[in-house]
Each structure stands twice: as C-alpha cells, then as structure tokens.
Regions:
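A late C-terminal transmembrane helix in Major Facilitator Superfamily
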Residues: 137, 147-185, 189, 194-195
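Transmembrane alpha-helical segments of major facilitator superfamily
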Residues: 75-84, 169
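Juxtamembrane intracellular "pre-TM" segments in multi-pass secondary transporters
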Residues: 9-40
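Small-residue hotspots at the loop-to-helix junctions and early N-terminal turns
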Residues: 70-78, 162-163
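C-terminal transmembrane helical hairpin of 12-TM major facilitator-type secondary transporters
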Residues: 101-146
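Pair of pore-lining "gating" transmembrane helices in MFS-fold secondary transporters
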Residues: 33-53, 133-134
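Short amphipathic helix-loop junctions that connect adjacent transmembrane helices
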Residues: 56-71
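Helix-to-loop junctions at the C-terminal end of transmembrane segments
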Residues: 86-100
Length: 202
C-alpha cells in the first residue's frame, strides 16, 4: 500500500553508491570467468531452459498428436504446475537439514526417471503429464539450490551476481528452446533425450 510510506520511517540510513557502467561490466566479466559461478549458474540456466523448452513443445504434442484443445491442455497443465510447487516446497523443507549440495543430487534422479518415462510412455495426456511432473519436480528442487549456491560467495556483489544469474537464465533458455525447436524437437521421446543430455551436462 502506497500509504505505508507515510506511516513507516526509513530504516536504511546509509545508501550505497550506484556503480558505474564500467565497474558493472568488470563485475560481469569476473563472474563469467569464475568457475564457481559458472558451475552453479549453468545448473540454473539449463534447468530453466528445460522448463521453457517443455512449455514450448508439450502444447504442440498434446494438440497436434492427441487433438486436444487449448482449454483442455490448460487444465492438464495444472499437473506439472504442481510439480514446481511441490519441488520448491520439498526443497525448502529438506534443504536446511541436508544442505544445498545433497539436495541438488535429487534432481538427476528425478530427471532420469522423467526421461525414461517420457521415452517409453504412451502418447496420452495423463502419461505425458506425469513425465512432465517428474521433470519439473526436479527443476523445482534444483533452481532454489543452484541460486543459493551461486549467491553464497558474492555478498559484496549480490546485485551483479543476481542480475547475471537471472539474465543468463532468460538468454540461455531462449536460445536453447529456439535451437531445439528448429532442430525438430516435436515428440515426447525427443524431449526425453534432451532431459538426459542436460542431466549429463549438469
């Protein structure tokens, strides 16, 4: 509520200086040349790319190969949407107990399970959505862990690290999704191979 500005006092008394464009470019360069940053940022980027690619391709599979309408697909898409909610909830509950790195190891197991399911399952709505649910459950676990690990050593450069991590997600996911679709990604089993490839890389 905008009226809160008049009811509460500002608690931040010291303001940080706005970095110059040259300093920001140096920070971005340092991040891109850091093995630590790139290791965990790439996990975030590829997991996000996998979600974007699936969101791009799955409606085509459901509508073109099964004959489903857009309204019907919107209802079925609630199933994988629950995967993201479930993944982040599980992550928030268990991660404080076992730590980021151990939690992150759950993702390859879920992704390989999703890949095997999508490769062998019949092309029917429920089966396809279960495969997508498993995959996005893994994404929901991986993304918060990777983001937390990316930010850990960069408390003094939190803004630059967050911007590079988030911006990289959008750029990489767009390029990956566009490339895969242009290469002919249009079947559920194609998607399963992509999941296996991304799992092997990360």
């Amino acid at each position: 509520d905008w009226s809160s500005e008049f009811r509460f006092k500002e608690t931040i008394t010291r303001r940080s200086a706005i970095p110059s464009p040259a300093k920001m470019l140096v920070q971005y360069r340092d991040l891109l040349s850091s093995r630590y940053f790139m290791s965990f940022a790439s996990i975030s980027w590829l997991n996000f790319s996998l979600m974007i690619t699936t969101v791009s391709v799955m409606p085509f599979i459901m509508q073109d190969q099964i004959g489903m309408t857009s309204d019907e697909y919107a209802m079925w898409a609630l199933i994988p949407a629950l995967g993201m909610l479930g993944g982040t909830t599980i992550c928030n509950r268990i991660r404080p107990v076992i730590g980021n790195k151990k939690m992150l190891l759950c993702t390859p197991v879920l992704h390989i399970s999703a890949a095997l399911w999508l490769f062998f399952c019949p092309v029917e709505p429920l089966y396809l959505m279960i495969g997508q649910l498993l995959m996005i459950l893994g994404n929901g676990i991986a993304l918060p862990c990777a983001q937390a690990l990316v930010m850990q050593p960069y408390k003094e450069q939190a803004g630059a690290a967050a911007a590079m991590s988030g911006g990289g997600q959008m750029v990489v996911s767009s390029l990956v999704s566009m490339t895969l679709v242009q290469l002919g990604l249009s079947e559920a089993w194609h998607l399963s191979l992509v999941v296996v490839l991304f799992t092997a890389i990360t």
